[in-house]
Amino acid sequence: MAGARGLLCLWLGCFCLNLAQGQRPNLHLPGLRGTESSDRMTGGGPSPDLRPHDKVSEHMLWLYDRYSGSNRAQATRTPGSQLPGPQPLRGGNTVRSFRAAAAGTLQRKGLHTFNLTSLTKSENILSATLYFYIGELVNTSVNCPESQGCSHDSQRQHIQIDLSAWTLQSNQSQLLGHLSVDTAKPYRDSMSWLSKDITQLLRKAKQDEEFLIGFNITSRAHELPKRMLLFPEPYILVYANDAAICEPESVVSSLQRHRDFTAGTVPRLDSHVREALSVERRKKRSTGILLPLQNNELPGAEYQYKEAGVWEERKPYKSLQTQPPEKSRSKKKQRKGPHQKGQTLQFDEQTLKKARRKQWIEPRNCARRYLKVDFADIGWSEWIISPKSFDAYYCSGACQFPMPKSLKPSNHATIQSIVRAVGVVSGIPEPCCVPEKMSSLSILFFDENKNVVLKVYPNMTVDSCACR
């Protein structure tokens, strides 16, 4: 017993001495070594079994947040994920995404096919990038034994990825070009998306009107896993400058043509992407209702209601009635055309007083006035992802002589107002209240092939008004 007690005291003394010298006893606990090796292999990132989300929609939403001034990019990005950094538009106004179709077979090679028919003749390709996922290849690396003490820099794979591009036709296929990518990256899931510039390939394909192309992804020294070729799909981002976007009614020609979308055919975004979009849509909506004033005066300020049921609760009109014809009316009034409306809205006294009060407050001169456009009201909400509505504003008001400097009249508008006021020449109208400065609007939508597109449309929001 005394001998055992002495050995115990000796062991405790050595243990305390090691702690004092900064050394740690080597305690082999079961299960920790396997976890440590796994973390070293993956770089502490997510498990390789975790499949990334819909990167195409997520990447396009990131670009929309960037070019529309939104602050939701961090909310959209999922924890532990990292989007490939986009390149600037460089003077362009369009970003198109193309999702790869199911892998096919061409000369016994797996292909990722892309349908580029959405590219228009007016769109000049500035740059194009192919994004593809190799996370499963990177994370299935050779495990570094703990006994060798491998450093972090040595845990790298230098694998050459070969990309062969093909133009696909009905009866034959033609090689478009070869590219290579070096995957000299650490073992982290955040680095498992690779990208390659394919600008010249797509320019050549567009010039030759070859809009169906395929990419074959192979490795020289390693066999790519079959699962990589199936999910997640590669995608292409094309940055372009649309020369026709400044033409009259360009926003209508590029957006209204998607009316062939039927219910249920519009693609659905990933759940976390839809949640990020819903942050903006949950903002309180205000509806401007212009009251009929039964004269030719300028419309008053709009009514804005915070709740949907306020208008019905207040009951500003009594009923929709048909006015009986008066017997004392002259035949001339009775012979008015059938286009004349026989129904008028009967407003209560409280509503009319409020309308008159707002008319008095409303500036009579040329000014910018509020207008909110909801794409659902014009039937475009099915294919427009964001924004669902925007503040367009409009210009209205008088440009009468003498015009103050605040109306910023042009020299021609000043002379025109003087001639009209003097009355030397009859029939001269007063200058018009028109937009002076306007700003662009970024719109994210689905094209006819159900690919996500970002376009920056100019002159969509009125910033200031002037007399011209």
Swiss-Prot record:
Task: Kindly state one GO CC term assigned in the UniProt record.
Answer: extracellular space
Q: Give the subcellular location.
A: Secreted
Matching PROSITE patterns: TGF_BETA_1, TGF_BETA_2
- List glycan-bearing residues: N115, N139, N171, N216, N459
Q: What processes does the entry annotate via GO biological process terms?
A: cartilage development; negative regulation of ossification; osteoblast differentiation; positive regulation of transcription by RNA polymerase II
Q: Which UniProt keywords apply?
A: Chondrogenesis, Cleavage on pair of basic residues, Cytokine, Developmental protein, Differentiation, Disulfide bond, Glycoprotein, Growth factor, Osteogenesis, Secreted, Signal
Signal sequence: where? 1-22
The record's region (Disordered) falls at 27-53, 72-93, 316-349
Residue ranges the record assigns to the propeptide: 23-358
Give the induction text: Expression increases in mesenchymal cells at fracture sites during healing. Also highly expressed in chondrocytes and osteoblasts at newly formed cartilage and bone.
Cite the record's Basic residues compositional bias ranges. 329-339
Residues crossing the lipid bilayer are none
Subunit-level organization: Homodimer; disulfide-linked.
Q: Which family does it belong to?
A: Belongs to the TGF-beta family.
Designated name of the protein = Bone morphogenetic protein 3
Q: Gene for this protein?
A: Bmp3
